[in-house]
C-alpha cells in the first residue's frame, strides 16, 4: 500500500504541467521565427490495469496543461478504479473554477470501444499505456500516437560502480510495488570482474 501511495504522490508532484510548454522565438536576417505549442483537442487514451489511477492522473494533467481534454478506454479489469480517478479529476477541476468533463470514460471498455475511439474522426491523437499489442495497434492506427509499451529495464553494473549501493538500489527498484511498474528493474547486466561482489550484496539485501 505504501508504494501505491508513493506513486500517487510522485504523479502529483512530478507530472510536467504548463511550465514545460514554452514559446520559442528567434530572429535573423530573414525575419522572425516563432514556435508556439497548440492543443490537439480531444485525445483518446488507453490505460492499463497495473497502474490505472496513476496513469489516468498523469495523462489528464499533462493533456489538460496542453489545452486538451481526454476520453479514456481503461483496462476492463480496472474500470472501477479508473472511474473513481476520473471523477476526482473532474471534481478538482470544478472546485478550481475549471470546466466539468475534462476527462471522461466509456462505462464498459472493450476492444470494440477501443477501436471506435481509435477510428473516431474527432480524436486526432491516441495515447496508449500497456502491452505490445495495444501499443502496436495505436501506432498503426493511421493517427498520431504515443505508445508506452511493456518494459524490461536492465540495471547495468560495471567496475566503476559503488557495488553495495548498486545492489541496494536494484533491490529497492525491483521490489517497488511488487515489480508491477514497467520502469522497475527486471534484469541485471554486470561485468564479470564484479559479479561475485554484486551477488554478495544482493543476497545481503534479501
Each model region followed by its residue ranges:
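N-terminal Rossmann-like NAD(P)+-binding subdomain of aldehyde/semialdehyde dehydrogenases
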Residues: 1-32
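A general structural motif at alpha-helix termini
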Residues: 8-9, 107, 121, 170
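Histidine (H) residue identity feature
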Residues: 8-9, 75, 120, 200
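Rossmann-like NAD(P) dinucleotide-binding subdomain of oxidoreductase/dehydrogenase enzymes
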Residues: 23-165
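ALDH superfamily catalytic-core signature
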Residues: 65, 135-206
Amino acid at each position: 500500500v505504501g508504494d501505491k501511495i508513493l506513486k500517487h504522490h510522485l504523479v502529483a508532484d512530478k507530472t510536467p504541467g504548463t511550465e514545460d510548454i514554452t514559446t520559442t522565438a528567434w530572429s535573423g536576417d530573414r525575419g522572425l521565427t516563432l514556435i508556439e505549442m497548440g492543443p490537439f483537442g480531444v485525445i483518446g487514451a488507453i490505460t492499463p490495469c497495473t497502474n490505472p489511477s496513476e496513469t489516468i492522473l498523469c495523462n489528464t494533467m499533462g493533456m489538460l496543461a496542453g489545452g486538451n481534454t481526454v476520453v479514456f478506454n481503461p483496462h476492463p479489469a480496472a474500470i472501477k478504479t479508473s472511474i473513481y480517478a476520473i471523477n476526482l479529476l473532474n471534481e478538482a477541476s470544478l472546485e478550481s473554477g475549471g470546466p466539468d468533463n475534462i476527462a471522461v470514460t466509456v462505462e464498459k471498455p472493450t476492444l470494440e470501444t477501443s477501436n471506435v475511439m481509435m477510428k473516431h474522426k474527432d480524436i486526432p491523437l491516441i495515447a496508449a499505456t500497456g502491452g505490445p499489442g495495444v501499443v502496436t495497434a495505436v501506432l498503426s492506427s493511421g493517427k498520431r500516437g504515443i505508445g508506452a509499451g511493456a518494459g524490461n529495464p536492465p540495471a547495468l553494473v560495471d567496475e566503476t560502480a559503488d557495488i553495495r549501493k548498486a545492489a541496494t538500489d536494484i533491490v529497492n527498484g525491483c521490489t517497488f510495488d511488487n515489480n508491477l511498474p514497467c520502469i522497475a528493474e527486471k534484469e541485471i547486466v554486470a561485468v564479470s570482474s564484479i559479479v561475485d561482489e554484486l551477488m554478495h550484496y544482493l543476497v545481503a539485501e534479501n
